[in-house]
């Protein structure tokens, strides 16, 4: 009888300890980069960027981002439009030590990115170093198709769990252009996914703000 009581007591104790063990959730997360929608309020721009990741180890995530950008540019030298799609893939590594039951992240990561796009020039000025008076702008619709670019991104960011499986995040990105196809006699002033391109400078920066939802698959 005493052995039975001791066994039952140990069983209850083990059950209580097991109930206190918090299991980590593994699943697919999908999200929206809302910085695109914010830009649409202040610029001649529209775009959409979707985010997806999956945890493959305790701190390691495989990440894919796909999107589309349409950007109008108008300055003293040129009036043009750039539009196209892009895809980015890479890894995030979580540096943050969570308390049991929490799923917050402070991470570093990288992306390898590619974009396919086209540009349309509506007006432009011809530069002449010997000209003293301002040049009238030439009006001529010129469409450049089949443009492309490749670059890499280094990233620092965070994701915080607002509610069960719902996250908000932000990231700062340093971009390095690797290769781009440019139209004859013109430059790519904007590359979808990379953002602004400046002459003789292959670097760029970007900030993202994201809302992310996790579809839990397993806990372990």
Where are the predicted features?
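Short glycine/proline- and aromatic-enriched beta-strand/turn motifs that initiate or cap beta-hairpins
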Residues: 12-55, 65, 210-220
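Short loop/turn motifs that connect adjacent beta-strands in outer-membrane beta-barrel proteins
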Residues: 15-26, 59, 97-105, 162-168, ...
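Residues that define the transmembrane beta-barrel architecture of outer-membrane proteins
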Residues: 26, 44-48, 83-87, 104, ...
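Membrane-embedded beta-strand positions of outer-membrane beta-barrel proteins
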Residues: 30-32, 52, 64, 89-91, ...
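Transmembrane beta-strands of outer-membrane beta-barrel pores
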Residues: 34-38, 66-72, 93-95, 112-118, ...
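Extracellular/periplasm-exposed beta-strand and loop segments of Gram-negative cell-envelope proteins
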Residues: 39, 67, 71-84, 117-128, ...
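Glycine- and aromatic-enriched membrane insertion/assembly motifs of diderm outer-membrane
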Residues: 43-100, 113-114
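Outer-membrane beta-barrel "beta-signal"
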Residues: 88, 92, 201-220
């Amino acid at each position: 009888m005493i052995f039975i009581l001791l066994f039952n007591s140990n069983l209850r104790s083990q059950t209580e300890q097991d109930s206190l063990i918090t299991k980590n959730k593994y699943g697919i997360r999908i999200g929206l980069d809302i910085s695109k929608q914010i830009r649409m309020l202040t610029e001649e721009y529209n775009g959409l960027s979707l985010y997806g990741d999956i945890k493959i180890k305790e701190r390691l995530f495989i990440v894919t981002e796909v999107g589309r950008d349409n950007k109008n540019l108008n300055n003293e030298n040129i009036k043009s439009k750039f539009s196209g799609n892009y895809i980015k893939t890479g890894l995030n590594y979580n540096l943050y030590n969570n308390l049991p039951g929490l799923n917050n992240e402070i991470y570093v990561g990288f992306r390898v990115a590619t974009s396919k796009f086209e540009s349309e020039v509506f007006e432009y000025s011809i530069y002449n170093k010997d000209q003293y008076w301002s040049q009238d702008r030439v009006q001529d619709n010129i469409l450049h198709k089949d443009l492309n670019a490749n670059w890499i991104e280094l990233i620092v960011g965070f994701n915080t769990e607002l509610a069960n499986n719902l996250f908000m995040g932000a990231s700062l990105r340093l971009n390095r252009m690797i290769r781009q196809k440019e139209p004859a006699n013109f430059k790519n002033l904007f590359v979808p996914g990379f953002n602004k391109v400046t002459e003789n400078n292959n670097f760029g920066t970007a900030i993202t703000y994201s809302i992310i939802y996790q579809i839990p698959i397993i806990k372990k």
